[in-house]
Regions:
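The feature encodes the CheY-like receiver
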Residues: 16, 58, 67, 76, ...
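Hydrophobic residue at a beta-alpha junction
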Residues: 33-34, 57-60, 69
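Alpha4 helix (beta4-alpha4-beta5 surface) of REC/receiver domains from two-component response regulators
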Residues: 64, 87-106, 113, 117-120
């Protein structure tokens, strides 16, 4: 069975490392991009089954990255799970505006089981 490839778009190296460990233990193939710009570039080069996307990044915020992904015909069908320190209630306008563009939302710090459950629901 082929492993599902998951792209982590995050600007915190420690969080990238943690997510890679979790994904590997969950049976996924993680690849990572340090920030939104690198994530968008990597998406042009690599095929992925899922994107884990941080919202608060220094170079491009996650909402803009999400908009660019969903505007690209080659990428718009790739599911996205938001992994952010911001609760949805902290950003209701953005969350409501983009609610049809992401498949899950996990708040940091998260319970590993909850993250893996959301991933399994999106890419079984």
């Amino acid at each position: 069975m082929t492993q599902k490839r998951v792209l982590i778009i995050e600007d915190d190296l420690d969080m990238i490392g943690l997510l890679k460990i979790i994904l590997k233990r969950g049976g996924y193939e993680p690849i990572s991009a340090l920030g939104g710009k690198e994530g968008l570039r990597l998406l042009q080069e690599a095929s992925v089954d899922l994107i884990l996307l941080d919202l608060m990044m220094d170079d491009i915020n996650g909402w803009e990255v999400l908009e660019r992904i969903k505007a690209d015909p080659a990428l718009r069908m790739v599911p996205v799970i938001i992994v952010s320190a911001r609760h949805q209630a902290e950003d209701p306008g953005q969350t409501e505006t983009h609610s049809d563009q992401f498949e899950g939302y996990v708040v940091k710090p998260f319970v590993v089981r909850d993250l893996l459950t959301q991933i399994q629901e999106v890419i079984p």
